[in-house]
Amino acid sequence: MPKRTDLRTILIIGAGPIVIGQACEFDYSGAQACKALRAEGFRVVLVNSNPATIMTDPDMADAVYIEPIHWRTVEKIITKEKPDALLPTMGGQTALNCALDLADHGVLEKYGVELIGAKREAIRMAEDRELFRVAMQEIGLECPKAEVAKSLERALEIQAKVGFPTIIRPSFTLGGTGGGIAYNRQEFEEIIKRGLELSPVHEVLVEESVLGWKEFEMEVVRDASDNCIIVCSIENLDPMGVHTGDSITVAPAQTLSDKEYQRLRDASIAVLRKIGVDTGGSNVQFGIDPQTGRVVVIEMNPRVSRSSALASKATGFPIAKIAAKLAVGYTLDELKNEITGGKTPASFEPSIDYVVTKIPRFAFEKFPQADARLTTQMKSVGEVMAMGRTFAESLQKAVRGLETGKVGLEPTGLDLSSEDDLVVLKRELKAPGAERLFYVADAFRAGFAVADVYALSYIDPWFLDQIEEIVAAEGRLVTDGLGSIDGARLRQLKRIGFSDARIAQLTGTNEVAVRTLRRVLKVKPVYKRVDSCAGEFATGTAYLYSTYEEECEAAPSDRRKIMILGGGPNRIGQGIEFDYCCVHAALALREDGFETIMVNCNPETVSTDYDTSDRLYFEPLTLEDVLEIVEVEHPVGVIVQYGGQTPLKLAKALEANGVPVIGTSPESIDLAEDRERFQRLVQQLGLRQPPNCTARTADEALVLAREIGYPLVVRPSYVLGGRAMEIVYSEADLARYVRDAVKVSNDSPVLLDRFLDNAVEVDVDIIADPEGQVLIGGVMEHIEEAGVHSGDSSCSLPPYSLSAATQDDLRRQVIRLAQALNVIGLMNTQFAIQSNDDGSDIVYLLEVNPRASRTVPFVSKATGVPLAKIAARCMTGKTLAEQSVTCEVVPAYYAVKEAIFPFAKLQGVDPILGPEMRSTGEVMGVGRSFAAAFARAQEAGDIRAPQPGRAFVSVRDPDKKRVLPVVLALVERGFGVVATAGTYAWLQQNGVACEVVNKVAEGRPHIVDLIKNGEIVYIINTTEGRAAIADSFSIRREALQHCVTYSTTIAGAKALVNSLEFRGTGPVWSLQELHKELQV
């Protein structure tokens, strides 16, 4: 049936900020849906609160709203834009929940908006655990034994029937939030209470354990005529009990017999028919008991998901694009498969002749207090995917793509001859953590048999055999040495995925020696195309991966090419913002007539969509892999400054190998990152830095620290995201840090800076062109004080409290720095501003990054100036004048960026902010005043507005004076105040009526008791020094558990309290309307 003609305007809801469980895969699906529907002539309206996405670019939809994804806000957009239909399946759990809210509150009916892609009943049946279970019984499919509970008492009754261990799954949450595995009653009660609190409908499923079973997923697409295809089968290497987002997964499934595969295929299609997913993609998860073959249905997602992004990238079949077209009436046989150049219809099931492995990326190093065991609640922050002709090849490529410093299945560091360490090894095999794969390899080194490892880990023996073979090959290499390797043996090693760097490690040589040998022996990779049909039809799409075979399918052109190196897997400190910049570079340079080549290995992103660039190499971002691609393609320029630290780390080595790195030179990048060289430059320019020094030994650090004075910010050199950075208040603190952190520094020195207390931090983004002209992109004033990592601080553009004179001073300093560093392209500079008693400001330069920064997308959305595109053109030789962009744009409205944190997912983590970055994503709010914009950003970040009740205040001495006006504003709004003794005395002295409450150490009833009893609605708590931070940890943690809004900085508290009156008020503006104001 052809497309519907009764629909004109379609509303798409995005997924909001990047959080654990919902990352940039929804930017990829949403961007695809926008493109597909506009190409069909529909008017598209988009709402998403995340400014770092490609889908919120003003040219992606006819009207783009960067607004909170809340049904009341979306209702305002519906009233204004009058859409005919709403497509809720492209924005993950967030969009589905919002669509259900709109339906339940009668909004869709009131405005005559039709849900397309998934009907309300289908969403309800798939997401409501009890309805789903009943539906499965009706079609003769089994689910694990389970019942739904809405209270702890009921949950305990069900638990008695299903026994321990028990799986707990809250309804309508994302990435298993609030769920877990309980092995005893105490754990069970804790997880149930948390799950009931975090489920929006306050219900949980209490389920029998299927731990250790094999887990499979089917990606299914169905159209309105009931045509169904399986796009891809996915097998989890980790057995049931680990969330599929945290599992290593492999496509296609490797250990299913044909009969079992057909059985799962039939079952998954039956599930879609029963649930009523009429059009679009869904993901169905199964568990199989390896002993009996019993099959159970675990769950299904009636929308595109993380797995469908993986399946799309693994097969080249664009699920989201096809799903969007099916939602408007097309059938699969009417749509063409673009990868085969339209030679096959979309109803032709993809088949692949290679193996794809996905490995998740974790961030436990950022959260040492978090429980690092993997369960049914997702904890990974990103993922990497690799392709190879064998499982071993794709596994080892994925390992080096993870960028955790490992170049293969390296030993974990256990002493395998020690009994104590073998106990640790067995525990690590049994209780999965982020590194289990490496412990499996260690088990084989320790002489374990496959059966022994299986008995502990329940990883299928087929996978274990492959890992054992890799370890055996390593052992032979260690014995024989590099000299014994001939061409045939080297080719065999490369075919099972060994990197040059790993071969060098095992043979005691270096990577250059191995590469030289490989060149002499003429062992080079070839590139194969992803074509969705296992080579049955020719493909014009250049979507490539490397392997060691005979025939190369790369067929490079002789056009002028620019290669863009992506950012690799998402992690804290390096996320979607960098992918956004890479995509913009590809789009701009393609428009300029260059052939664009993207190199990346992150399956979630828009950059790895095969039609973002002319040629896509799905490869790890290591020196070896990049050099091989350069050798085939011969680009005229390679861009390293857009993918964050990942490609920057390669800049010098690429240049040394004759690769044309364009933009700011690796020499200038090094000058900005090398502390001592940079300090000399700052002194030459007559700019001011906080007193600082560099220490190469622990003793030297303690001596120099006495000269600078405490408090200090200490960190290793060369880091991104503030890794291992800390504020220390005493010599004892510094001694402990130097003991622990010098390990991080790999013989590179420790940096000490005087910490500027109560300073305002400012970020400035600029572009410099080849002639040294500079365009100020934006000046952003941070809301949290200096000392909170810039990626974790909210910020406002334009600044809300800085004087015009200070802002002009910042602009002057930035221009001088850019010119002195010979920057071509983007540069980000951070300043701290301290006020003197006479009201004048002192400006301190904190750091300069001559690369894309994480604020680029936010600034671009706020000002309407596409910084990443303009800067990419500067790198290829165009001036700012030639691009007609020479004036800074300062909007008349305010835009506020707010950071989003993963604390709810990571039990036991202290949510206090500091110099180490811990946020996973961001949202943006726009308003006519700073307070209104801040209120909108808080709504978008789902930060509850405290309603009048009792506010708890406990602040460090230097903050007492500054907290007074905030407390007075709270009292004026009808809040009561409780405070700890010191703060209580200060408030009483200043005429504020309040009650005193015990600190936790002072006896009961104390403040945590009040929080647990629901008596506190808002918390202001600032601390300094390790002891005070540790003492007040339980306050912040309980606030998080009980969803009490809290502020850990005075500036944050002031902004929040002043914004309360603007919550839920004001009109909505599309980006197009806002940007039109700027052009006047």
Curated annotation (Swiss-Prot):
Record text on cofactor binding: Binds 4 Mg(2+) or Mn(2+) ions per subunit.
Binding site for Mn(2+) 1: Q285, E299
Positions contributing to Mg(2+) 3 binding: Q830, E847
SUPFAM superfamilies, per database record: Carbamoyl phosphate synthetase, large subunit connection domain (SSF48108), Glutathione synthetase ATP-binding domain-like (SSF56059), Methylglyoxal synthase-like (SSF52335), PreATP-grasp domain (SSF52440)
PROSITE patterns: ATP_GRASP, CPSASE_1, CPSASE_2, MGS
Annotated segments matching region Carbamoyl phosphate synthetic domain: 555-942
Keywords from the UniProt entry: Amino-acid biosynthesis, Arginine biosynthesis, ATP-binding, Ligase, Magnesium, Manganese, Metal-binding, Nucleotide-binding, Pyrimidine biosynthesis, Repeat
Record: residues binding ATP 1: R129, R169, G175, G176, E208, V210, E215, G241, V242, H243, Q285, E299
CDD domains to which the protein is assigned, alphabetical: MGS_CPS_II (cd01424)
Signal peptide: none
Region (Oligomerization domain) residue spans: 404-554
Enzyme class: ligase
InterPro entries per UniProt: ATP-grasp (IPR011761), CarbamoylP_synth_lsu (IPR006275), CarbamoylP_synth_lsu_oligo (IPR005480), CarbamoylP_synth_lsu_oligo_sf (IPR036897), CbamoylP_synth_lsu-like_ATP-bd (IPR005479), CbamoylP_synth_lsu_CPSase_dom (IPR005483), MGS-like_dom (IPR011607), MGS-like_dom_sf (IPR036914)
Top-level taxon of origin: Bacteria
Molecular function via GO: ATP binding; carbamoyl-phosphate synthase (ammonia) activity; carbamoyl-phosphate synthase (glutamine-hydrolyzing) activity; metal ion binding
Family to which this protein belongs: Belongs to the CarB family.
Domains as described in the record: The large subunit is composed of 2 ATP-grasp domains that are involved in binding the 2 ATP molecules needed for carbamoyl phosphate synthesis. The N-terminal ATP-grasp domain (referred to as the carboxyphosphate synthetic component) catalyzes the ATP-dependent phosphorylation of hydrogencarbonate to carboxyphosphate and the subsequent nucleophilic attack by ammonia to form a carbamate intermediate.
Protein name: Carbamoyl phosphate synthase large chain
Protein's gene: carB
